[in-house]
């Protein structure tokens, strides 16, 4: 199956594209886009991969579901398009960055600049029906994104995996902690941010680890 995804990822994920679950998923997604308003726009489904080739990945942040409001989702977890109001979780992410490393909140919630520095901003589910949170869960995306995380964890070394909330922590449970840095805390959602997200210092810890392993730090 010819999937429109960045070449290095295509090479590493090729086996997935031939599996029955992925064929079923593709049929489902095509059908959904033809009948409903689906986010993100079709050409941005694999945006996280396209902006961050396999060998350039330094950090992986695992999200759950794309934003389901108009103009928000563009294929990167927690990120929104330029000119779109910051969702509450993103507000809290920027608050923690300011508290942790002193960088003030930017004027845009578009995290493309992180992706271009090697941060894979990966949602577990890559599509969603407008205004229906979780509507594309358990259709096969989770299996596909598990495969992406697994191939990174197995074939790369000294990556940083950032797992916010129990969902991301379960998804990253198999990652070898001797080979990679795994940072876990509560989710930045207003419902849980004060239960361990604020003060987690994940941004400075990530950069300390990257620096210790001879990698360029992320300009958060």
Curated annotation (Swiss-Prot):
Q: What class of enzyme is it?
A: hydrolase
**In the Enzyme Commission scheme, what number(s) does this protein have?**
3.2.2.27
- What molecular function terms (GO) are annotated for this protein? uracil DNA N-glycosylase activity
- List, alphabetically, the Pfam families matched: UDG
Cystine links in this protein are: none
Q: Mind telling me which SMART domains this protein's record contains?
A: UDG (SM00986), UreE_C (SM00987)
Enumerate the UniProt keywords alphabetically. Cytoplasm, DNA damage, DNA repair, Hydrolase
The annotated active site, in chain numbering, is: 65
Q: Which PROSITE patterns match?
A: U_DNA_GLYCOSYLASE (PS00130)
Q: Does the keyword DNA repair apply?
A: yes
- List the subcellular locations: Cytoplasm
Any single Gene Ontology cellular-component annotation: cytoplasm
Q: Which reaction does it catalyse?
A: Hydrolyzes single-stranded DNA or mismatched double-stranded DNA and polynucleotides, releasing free uracil
Q: Name one GO biological process term.
A: base-excision repair, AP site formation via deaminated base removal
The record's annotation in InterPro entries points to: UDG_fam1 (IPR002043), Ura-DNA_Glyclase_AS (IPR018085), Uracil-DNA_glycosylase-like (IPR005122), Uracil-DNA_glycosylase-like_sf (IPR036895)
State the HAMAP family in the record.
Answer: UDG (MF_00148)
Described purpose of this protein according to its UniProt entry: Excises uracil residues from the DNA which can arise as a result of misincorporation of dUMP residues by DNA polymerase or due to deamination of cytosine.
Instruction: Provide the family line.
Output: Belongs to the uracil-DNA glycosylase (UDG) superfamily. UNG family.
Q: What is this protein called?
A: Uracil-DNA glycosylase 2
